């Protein structure tokens, strides 16, 4: 079996919550990550934005705390998602979320 596990920390820049027609609670946030990492013995600035999806009852207790400007760490798996306009992007499906502030 292939491995698919990602840990990413950052600041929430957008957040929305909704329930699917089947009644499942979902939160969709945009996570902005900034860090510095070494690559080929050179310090490199790293920046990315990634959409994070939190689904199910286990996240209902934290959903109200997921506001713009809050720092979090997310663990989960990545998957390809196609938007309504046909563009593909990677999204992070959360399995664990930890508030950092």
Curated annotation (Swiss-Prot):
UniProt record, GO biological process? DNA replication, synthesis of primer
Pfam families to which the protein is assigned, alphabetical: SSB_1
Instruction: Specify the SSB domain's residue ranges.
Output: 1-101
* InterPro entries given in the database record: NA-bd_OB-fold, Primosome_PriB/ssb, Prisomal_replication_PriB
Under the heading SUPFAM superfamilies, the entry gives: Nucleic acid-binding proteins (SSF50249)
Give this protein's Gene Ontology molecular function annotations. single-stranded DNA binding
Name the source's superkingdom.
Answer: Bacteria
Gene Ontology CC annotations of this record: primosome complex
Q: Which UniProt keywords apply?
A: DNA replication, DNA-binding, Primosome
Keyword presence, NAD: no
**Main function:** Involved in the restart of stalled replication forks, which reloads the replicative helicase on sites other than the origin of replication; the PriA-PriB pathway is the major replication restart pathway. During primosome assembly it facilitates complex formation between PriA and DnaT on DNA; stabilizes PriA on DNA. Stimulates the DNA unwinding activity of PriA helicase.
Concerning its family, UniProt says: Belongs to the PriB family.
Oligomeric state and interaction partners are given as: Homodimer. Interacts with PriA and DnaT. Component of the replication restart primosome. Primosome assembly occurs via a 'hand-off' mechanism. PriA binds to replication forks, subsequently PriB then DnaT bind; DnaT then displaces ssDNA to generate the helicase loading substrate.
According to UniProt, the name of this protein is: Replication restart protein PriB
Natural source organism: Shewanella woodyi (strain ATCC 51908 / MS32)
Taxon lineage: Bacteria, Pseudomonadati, Pseudomonadota, Gammaproteobacteria, Alteromonadales
Q: Which gene encodes it?
A: priB
